[in-house]
Every structure is written in C-alpha cells, then in structure tokens.
Amino acid sequence: MKHGQDARAATAGKGSCKNLVRHLRRIVAVAGFLLVVLHIRADSAVLARALEQEGQHSLAALEYRRAALAATNAADAARWHWLAAHAYAAGHEWKLAGHMLDLVEETGLSGLDVPLVWLRAEQTLAERDWPAADFYFDSLVRRAEGAEWQAYAQRGRSIARLRRGDVAGARGGLESAPLEAVERYAAGRDRRPWVGGLLGLVPGLGYFYSGEIGNGVRSLLLNSLFIWGLVETAQDDQWAVFSVLAFAEFTWYSGSIYGGIDAAHRYNRRRLDAAVDALRDVERPRAVYDTLPVLTLRFEF
C-alpha cells in the first residue's frame, strides 16, 4: 500500500515538473527571451552559484565539473559541462572554456544549441580566431530568435569580418548606427607602412603622415639637435665627442624611419579599433539562473 502511494506521489511529482516546464515555455513565448530548462536539480548547483556570485569563477567551474563526473548519463554531464564553460568564460579562461564546450559537443545535446554557439562565438572572438568567430556568429544569426539576439549576433559577425578585412561582408544585416560605423571605416583610408618609412627619411615626417604630431616634433627636434652637435664638434675637432654624437644620431635617424612604419600600423589599428568599439556598443546576453525545482537558464539583455 505504501509502495503504491510512493509511486503515485513520484508520478505526480514528475507530472508537476512537466507542467512547470510547459508553463515556463509558454511564458518565454510571450516574453521573447531565450530560456533553457537544464533538467538539473537547483540544489545541486548551490555552492557553484554562490562561488560565481563571489567572482570565484574558476572554483565554480570546478564544482560544475565535479557534478559532471557524478552525472548518471551523458546528457546531464553535458549540461554541467556547459555551466563549467560559462563559468570559465566569465573568468576569461577561454582555453578551459573551449575544452568544456568540446565535451558538450561530443554528446550532441540539442537543447543547448543556442547557448553552445553563443559561448563558442565569444571564445573564438576572445582568442582572435576571426574565421571561426565569423562562422559561429553567423550560426547564431541563423539559430537565435528575438531582436536582441539578432542585433548581438549580427554585430559580432561584423566585428569578426572587419578583423578579417572583409568590409563588404561586415555590412550584412546591419542597420542605422552599426552600419554607419562600418561605412565610416570603409570610407576612411589606411596609412601605408612603406610610405611612412619612406617619409621617415626626413625626421618627423613619417609620424606626421600618421597623425602622431607629438612624436613627429620630438623626432625632428632630437635629430636636429644631434646634427647641430655633429657640426659644432667637427668644427672644433672634437672627434671623440663627434663619434658619440654620430652613433646617437644614427640611432635616432634609423628610429625615425622605423617609427614612421610603426606609426602607420598604429594608425590603421586605431581606425579599426574605433569601428569595432562602435559595433560592440550593444547589450550582451547575460545568463540568469532561476532557482526552481529544476535549474533553469534564461538570457536577458
């Protein structure tokens, strides 16, 4: 008799969990944000969540990995590994985050498609793997729903393409302010390093070419000072001092040439970084865990 009551209670509990999940999904359909039911008991993640809130992301990730080892099936282990990857990503430990995502991908768990692609896109962008970042952000554009997700994914894809030098592709899907940022970048002109080096033959001009007025003036003054010193010491037959000044002048003069080359590279980097910063000016998804009988992950902007 008691066994029958326990069985009915367990069946009722499972039914209530299923009803809760269906109810949450209906809410999500109205609210428009992504929600993932992880089917993990919330009390199993209490310590890890507390560590994350304290900013101890590495320790939190270890707790999630410990839970993955104790999981009774591959699907649950994959969910714990995704949580570990998210914790590592929050601590900017991208290599470890990537390893955890590899373990998730091995299971082929479909319920984590969008969260998995999102973290992959973040990881590859942080690791400056521009082709891979382009691929994952493009996948996110195709899979994620909602205006906020689309805006985030499209901008991320544009950043990856700009970094790759694909300015035409970076325009894809953009509107208003982000599109204007790409158009401004496309309308501008990079400085050519070889031109900067050639102009550097005249002290300071290589810097002026790339807009580094302060460095240009400094180079011009110092080279002029050394040349004046060379003339004065030669007229006074002070050849020992002349030799020291000649070495210093050779160093500063060659520095003017190489400085012109470096200044051109810096100019191009600043111009690209300005366009990327404008594209980054968008709300990023934030993973929020709801404390329910089953751990639920939703993303807010």
Where are these regions (language model features)?
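Short, low-complexity intrinsically disordered segments enriched in A/P/G/S/L with frequent Arg
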Residues: 7-9, 15-16, 28
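Hydrophobic alpha-helical membrane-anchor/signal-helix detector
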Residues: 189-266
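Start-of-helix register in tetratricopeptide repeats
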Residues: 76-79, 115, 149-152
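Canonical tetratricopeptide repeat
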Residues: 80-83, 119, 156
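N-terminal, post-signal-peptide region of Sec/Tat-exported proteins
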Residues: 52-96
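Hydrophobic h-region of N-terminal signal peptides that target proteins for export
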Residues: 33-41
